[in-house]
């Protein structure tokens, strides 16, 4: 992966790591590269989530873009998938989303989209990185009338809302849904989408103040949603993350429906409707073992990729598949969107609920989740890429894998967005897999 851009763009602690200077440099380099690629003055749209550092980084990005002669179109607070959708609608050459997704408020990130709405290719990202890090002297600043313009797209959120609503072929009359907006981008759109389609909405965490994004709420903290669903007698609850590109659900009993179960529900429904392309659902190596058993039992192919929605999308495009996603709630429905879209996912869940007449708990029962233990081990920069070269660690993983046999599995991997090694173990006996996970984690900590 690149030196600035990880699996999900450039990310770090805002201002001190992801600095204003770096944001301006990314704006300049991206605008220059895109102007060269398109052979015309680049038009770049910019969205952001609701965190306090978004305004500052947006200003720096805009300054960078316009200082090399490109035009910047500001969308305001919108979901990440809105940028991917609007870049095509507005005939832009690229889109930028300023967000750190599910991370806490001190973090922020910069993610780039191409003019087709897909994440910018590795080749273009590498070219942008090289211009910033290796040959900054090649950046050509403009002056006078050659400086770029700044435009404000005041209808951006509504353009996205209308698009999502148009993908729904039924109404949600009679459905009570609780929506946890994570005090982020979903606060702008979710209620309008679901109430506009007829649902009765119970709103949670929909008042962002710049500092409360993802704070004990949203898809990483669903306890409040679980309680709200039960207390308010809802049919279902939906939890989004800070930029609303992922969605988790809660059934009417308050039980979690994670991304794996959402994929199972969707793939089963799509197969029954004859719209599951190539009879395949794309998942990752972190997908619950229960999904693979469900898929096999239902004649569905589970195509497997590395962790990261960009790899899921690559496999979908390569194989001509129309559904894929991750346990975290990144669900890509390629018939409608080029990226994970939490609010779109939520509308499709309610569509299945309405069209089948089943309760959310009944839909989720199509798949049995195996107990899964995840231990995150913090590592320093000098230890990155080292764990799998330590015989004591690899021997332990092999030994515990043999003990689990077909009734479990072990996956150890480095995070693409945080300084962590993740140790994940699945199996039927929670006590055993917890013990194994912590023993492996201890070995990694000692390396």
Place the predicted regions along the sequence by residue:
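Phosphate-binding and adjacent anionic-ligand microenvironments
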Residues: 236, 273-447
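Short glycine-centered, acidic/aromatic-flanked micro-motifs in structured strand/loop junctions
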Residues: 47-49, 179-181, 251, 335, ...
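N-terminal small/polar loop signature for handling phosphorylated ligands or for N-terminal nucleophile
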Residues: 32, 36, 40-107, 192-250
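General beta-strand structural signal in soluble alpha/beta enzymes
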Residues: 5-6, 46, 72-76, 97-98, ...
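An N-terminal, well-structured beta->alpha segment
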Residues: 1-63, 67-68, 146-177, 384-389
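Proline/glycine-rich low-complexity loops and linkers
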Residues: 126-161, 166, 252-325, 332
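Gly/Ser/Thr-enriched, mixed-charge loops and adjacent short helices
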Residues: 13, 108-232
